Amino acid sequence: MSPPAATFDIPVANTGNGLSLKKDLAVKPAASGVAKSLAEIEHNWEKFTFAPIRESQVSRAMTRRYFNDLDTYAESDVVIIGAGSCGLSAAYTLASKRPDLKIAMVEAGVAPGGGAWLGGQLFSAMVMRKPAELFLNEIGVPYEDEGDFVVVKHAALFTSTLMSKVLNFPNVKLFNATAVEDLITRPAPTSNDPNAVRIAGVVTNWTLVSMHHDDQSCMDPNTINAPLIISTTGHDGPFGAFSVKRLVSMQQLPQLGGMRGLDMRTAEDAIVKRTREVVPGLIVGGMELSEVDGANRMGPTFGAMVLSGVKAAEEAIGVWDERKAQNDE
């Protein structure tokens, strides 16, 4: 039996183009404009005009929806940090299998997709080793079969297709240009570690604000509570490997293993197999995991990122009920 779909107390738009739009606000029908199809506009540009609008309508249309999303997702079921190929794959898999869960994605960049807009060295083609082509079949991305691996003609085709599918789920919200600055914790002492914690949410801020804490003062953050976090922030960098570096500074991990040199043959298997809940409430996947375990990097091949995301979603489904019960205590 499939789980019930997530429900939100937000009115659905009563007008539009007939396509299924997610949790929109009620809007008024257009006051003018008689064209019923694009074909009626073509070759008739002399009489063309847009429907009337005031600038305040645009402001309200954006802010009303955004702040409703902030309110709705302040208590989420799962937060995914990072919307690269691993995070997007995790979101797709999780939203597909558990439509009852509210999933918030937090991405520091303006453009989601991470490094998956291009292949290696800014080339266009994207390579995935088999059996990652099964995920491409799932989302409908064409490829050329090269035997043991497949090639997507342009990485942007994969990323844009996956992103459009993720954003069309009614239970997923992407907060891009938003950085995770910290993790929310709760005491979870064990017999071996009386100072152990579980992760219970994320601390967020606008990315542009996060980048200027050194030259501006008193810019406090916001928060999202969730019983389970999936962190896919990539290898070490300005925003990369954020969650695992924070675990070290909180003394929840002894130290990072440090990503090793490039070895495609060992790296991809290691990343997928080791994708797991590192501490209670925090699942780590993708290249961020290489910094924990000291795994090799795989370079310009993307199959491990995709299948690590799939496994992260599977791990999340496996522990979510337990983490939710703990979160409700």
Curated annotation (Swiss-Prot):
Keywords: Cytoplasm, Iron, Metal-binding, NAD, Nucleus, Thiamine biosynthesis, Transferase. Its EC number is 2.4.2.60. GO terms for biological process: mitochondrial genome maintenance; thiamine biosynthetic process; thiazole biosynthetic process. It catalyses: [ADP-thiazole synthase]-L-cysteine + glycine + NAD(+) = [ADP-thiazole synthase]-dehydroalanine + ADP-5-ethyl-4-methylthiazole-2-carboxylate + nicotinamide + 3 H2O + 2 H(+). The keyword Glycoprotein does not apply. Substrate binds at C86, E107, A108, G115, V180, D220, H235, M287, R297, M298, G299. Involved in biosynthesis of the thiamine precursor thiazole. Catalyzes the conversion of NAD and glycine to adenosine diphosphate 5-(2-hydroxyethyl)-4-methylthiazole-2-carboxylic acid (ADT), an adenylated thiazole intermediate. The reaction includes an iron-dependent sulfide transfer from a conserved cysteine residue of the protein to a thiazole intermediate. The enzyme can only undergo a single turnover, which suggests it is a suicide enzyme. May have additional roles in adaptation to various stress conditions and in DNA damage tolerance. This is Thiamine thiazole synthase.
